[in-house]
Amino acid sequence: MLEHVLVLSAYLFSVGLYGLITSRNMVRALICLELIFNAVNINFVTFSDFFDSRHLKGSIFAIFVIAIAAAEAAIGLAILSAIYRNRKSIHINQSNLLTK
């Protein structure tokens, strides 16, 4: 069972990393970053259950990561909305805010 969950987590992490590297759209990049966070959370919960199922340290840490990821997504979407209002584009290569 452990191997299946780790393969799933590695697949999610790989898809998220590939999407983050190749994405030109900021929304897609944020979604891929969330995929990476979810893969890490799966690992936390899996290893916590595998090594010591009596303690919920991995699950508690995963809840903290989910809360931080939600805050990151909210701040990221707010920044993205401000960039779209100013630049009328959400492409990563067109979002150089140092030039006018």
Curated annotation (Swiss-Prot):
Keyword presence, NAD: yes
Designated name of the protein: NAD(P)H-quinone oxidoreductase subunit 4L, chloroplastic
Gene encoding the protein: ndhE
The organism of origin for this protein: Trachelium caeruleum
An MF annotation (GO) of this entry: quinone binding
Keyword Plastid assigned: yes
High-level lineage: Eukaryota, Viridiplantae, Streptophyta, Embryophyta, Tracheophyta
PANTHER family: NADH-UBIQUINONE OXIDOREDUCTASE CHAIN 4L, NADH-UBIQUINONE OXIDOREDUCTASE SUBUNIT ND4L
Enzyme Commission numbers on file: 7.1.1.-
Membrane-spanning ranges: 1-21, 31-51, 60-80
The entry's keywords: Chloroplast, Membrane, NAD, NADP, Plastid, Plastoquinone, Quinone, Thylakoid, Translocase, Transmembrane, Transmembrane helix, Transport
Pfam families to which the protein is assigned, alphabetical: Oxidored_q2 (PF00420)
Reaction(s) this enzyme catalyzes, per UniProt: a plastoquinone + NADH + (n+1) H(+)(in) = a plastoquinol + NAD(+) + n H(+)(out); a plastoquinone + NADPH + (n+1) H(+)(in) = a plastoquinol + NADP(+) + n H(+)(out)
Annotated localization: Plastid, Chloroplast thylakoid membrane
Top-tier EC class: translocase
